[in-house]
Amino acid sequence: DRIERAFGVKRADAEQLAGDPVTAAFFEEAAAGLSGKAAQTVANLVVNELAAYLKASGVALGESGIAPAQVASLAKLLASDAISSNQAHEGFEAMAASGDDPEKIVDERGMRQVSDAGALQPIVDEVLAACADQAQQYRDGNHKVIGFLVGQCMKASRGKGNPKLFNELLRASLS
């Protein structure tokens, strides 16, 4: 209850975090000074990525070598849309294996998402030209096809484009 109020994270996550004093202390250190989306992102990383890593490796949190500051850094990258959730997963695994800072991992591996509309619009235009049938389906009311078009944009950008921004640009171009 205290974690939920203090950091604004979802109740289920707060309960899971509070269930273990070591995990709760780790979360609180990682989320210090954060609230809202960034704090929830830390909670998600601790509850999902960290818990899965600890279970798979059979290592206790205190012996994992993963620091709260590393999780906070990864959470900030994810919350700011600098990386996608898939890239956060990849970054977490690399961080756990190497002990490197997530910023360094993201930069060395070229994982940072492109979130510049000016850079992504030409890709959107190419995809819409190549997928004229799907574009027409969208205009005719089949809005589910947007997922396919976002996927084509992601493929064309080799995973570097921000999918949320592609979605917005596609919808704007198709309206």
Q: What role is predicted for each listed range?
A:
Residues D1-S175:
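Charged, compositionally biased, marginally structured helical/coil segments
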